[in-house]
Design a protein with these regions (language model features):
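Polybasic/polar functional segments that serve as interface/processing modules
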Residues: 1-282
Length: 282
């Protein structure tokens, strides 16, 4: 993940360290299956996906695919494209929601219509640095209602979980009628978000080419991540000057839609890590 520098001036001329927002915004859009287009969203071209990501203020740096889906490592987190599902997860000051209209446009061009959406994020460390669409959860909800409110009778639902006085809160917006997916195979997801990371472990995720850095694959092994996801084909990336991202595709079955993804912001003072395992059969 690429660090972002905020332009800040102070009275005494002392400048704070650049801040990077590790907390991710995540949107998961399910689409109706198209009987005449089995590949569905996977028919959206790379150039079109690049345009979608540019609108969200990020870019694709790597891709790995199997029979079920395509997994993209982004400059800020990850994108997963299935025939009937798209998962976009971005951190920093990316403008995730700004990419939604372009995503829906190209989905429509390949005959795909949305049926359900789920948007989630935790509290931002520096909300004042976020783009206008993400300035507040109210702003995000207004945008989501405009684009997905019609999927539920009476509109979508938004929730804020946890107490603001006790720290981090979890923000959730969902829209889509339950009857639209009640016959689908149930899936489970686990997402763990962490702050105040161990400094010694964070050192493994700095790109120091002249000192200890060998390769992204070696970083994945040395950090212990590979041992956690031994059954996954891992696409990993270490950023300059620091930061780490990986996508994992379950390699035990070529037809498995299960994926994992990890993103680490190692800088002291605003360190952050997230680990997600999704599409696990229940």
């Amino acid at each position: 993940m690429v660090a972002a520098t905020a332009s800040v001036t102070t009275v005494d001329g002392v400048y704070p360290s650049p801040h990077f927002e590790g907390a991710e915004k995540r949107i998961e859009i399910d689409f109706h299956a198209n009987e005449t287009n089995a590949r569905g969203l996977r028919e959206v071209t790379r150039a079109q996906l690049d345009e979608c990501m540019a609108a969200a203020h990020c870019e694709i740096v790597s891709v790995r695919s199997n029979a079920k889906f395509d997994a993209y490592v982004l400059s800020e987190s990850s994108l997963f494209v299935f025939p009937t599902k798209l998962v976009l997860k971005t951190c920093g000051t990316t403008n995730l929601l700004a990419g939604v209209p372009t995503i829906l446009k190209y989905a429509s061009q390949v005959g795909m219509e949305s049926r359900r959406v789920k948007f989630t994020r935790s509290s931002f460390d520096k909300p004042d640095l976020q783009p206008k669409l993400h300035a507040s959860f109210d702003d995000e909800t207004v945008f989501l209602e405009e684009h997905f409110g019609h999927l539920s009778p009476g509109g979508g639902s938004s929730y804020i979980l946890g107490s603001k006085l006790k720290g981090v809160q979890w923000h959730l917006y969902v829209s889509g009628s339950a009857c639209q997916w009640q016959d689908a195979q149930p899936k489970a997801s686990l997402e763990v978000c962490m702050t105040h990371l161990n400094r010694e472990h964070c050192e493994k995720h700095f790109y120091r080419k002249e000192e200890t850095f060998v390769s992204s694959a070696q970083t994945t092994t040395d950090s212990g991540i590979r041992s956690i996801f031994e059954d996954f084909a891992i696409d990993d990336y270490v950023f300059e000057p620091c930061g780490y991202s990986m996508n994992g595709l379950n390699k035990l079955s070529a037809t498995d839609s299960q994926f994992s993804t990890i993103h680490i912001t190692p800088e002291d003072g605003f360190s952050y890590a997230s680990c997600e395992l999704s599409n696990v059969d229940v």
